[in-house]
Design a protein with these regions (language model features):
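Intrinsically disordered, low-complexity and often Lys/Arg-enriched segments
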Residues: 1-2, 116-119
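Acidic, metal-binding active-site segment of PIN/NYN-like and related structure-specific nucleases
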Residues: 46-63
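C-terminal structural segments of small proteins and small subunits
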Residues: 70-114
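N-terminal first-folded block
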Residues: 2-50
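Glycine-rich nucleotide phosphate-binding loop and flanking beta-alpha elements
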Residues: 11, 59-61, 115
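Glycine-rich loop at the start of a catalytic domain that most often binds anionic cofactors/ligands
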Residues: 64-69
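Small/polar loops that bind or transfer phosphate-bearing groups
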Residues: 5-6, 54-55, 77
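Ribonuclease/tRNase effector modules and their secretory precursors
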Residues: 1, 19, 91-95
């Protein structure tokens, strides 16, 4: 199980995931795919049977059109700080990984704070 971190997420998340959860993770820039199209990235991830962590809904559409693999972790919490995203993933990622291990192809991670609560 390897997680590819899409370009609109901080590449630092990859190292944090490795250090925090002991799961292989790599930023797309580090494997030469930072400037790839969504389709190119999706097909490369399909070939490698990886997990793509992304904020981009295009990956959800590609998954619907082309099927898994890859599996998708879809981050829908909007713009947020790296610190807040790490806090959110620190809580959610164990359950997300369990769902993926159980065969889910798409898991959405969102911030369910009440409106107006500060991040």
């Amino acid at each position: 199980m390897t997680i590819w971190i899409d370009a609109q997420l901080s590449p630092a998340l990859a190292l944090w995931i490795v250090q925090t959860f002991g799961i292989p993770a790599v930023a797309l820039r580090d494997i030469g795919l930072r400037d790839g199209t969504d389709r190119q990235i999706f097909l490369a991830a399909k070939e490698q049977s990886t997990i793509v962590m992304t904020k981009d809904a295009d990956f959800v559409r590609l998954l619907e059109d082309l099927g898994p693999p890859p599996q998708i972790i879809w981050i829908t919490c909007g713009n947020t700080s790296n610190a807040h995203l790490k806090q959110l993933l620190g809580t959610a990622l164990p359950r997300v990984l369990a769902l993926l291990s159980d065969g889910e192809s798409l898991v959405e991670v969102s911030d369910l704070r009440p409106k107006g609560e500060k991040r």
